[in-house]
Amino acid sequence: LTLAYAAAKILDSSIDIKKLGALSLRGRCEKIASNLYVDVGHNELGAKAVAKKFSQEEFGGKKLTLVYNSFLDKDFKAVLAALKPVIEDVLLYHYHCEGRELGGELINKALNELEISHREFEPSDMNDIKEAKNGKIYLAFGSFHLAEAFLKEYYASKGL
């Protein structure tokens, strides 16, 4: 946003960012279904913002099931530590991204060190998310690649 504002300011010096209304950005804590949110956060700052949102009264202290994975070059331990206060457990979601390696065993190690319950994401998990009958709130959190892969699978499971 800052870069776009700087470019717009060059083209029209009368532009004032303070006059910009509230933004609704796709993939930023976006509610997909009654029990499913997606956030394209991939760093500690994004994780802290999400933790703050899910700490609010509207969620009544309910903990999330985090659908997560991260690229190897990210500080996933800091991300997970920031999210720990609002998550019950983690489902490790695997996807392919050409030329980028996922954190793999190092994410498992970080989760163990942080004492966060976790396991691999399974097809039955997508059914649970889709059916929304188990009372859980799910948050798919990670890169644009994770969000895209997860949402494709989610919508395909719904026949969309």
Briefly describe each language-model feature range:
Residues 67-69, 93, 141:
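Short hydrophobic segments within beta-strands
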Residues 1-89:
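Nucleotide phosphate-binding/pyrophosphate-handling subdomain across enzymes
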Residues 42-43, 72-73, 96-97, 144-146:
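Short glycine-rich anion-binding loops that position phosphate/pyrophosphate groups of nucleotides
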Residues 47-48, 76-78, 101-102, 149-152:
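Short glycine-/acidic-enriched loop or helix-start segments at secondary-structure transitions
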Residues 80-137:
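C-terminal helical cap/extension that packs against the catalytic core
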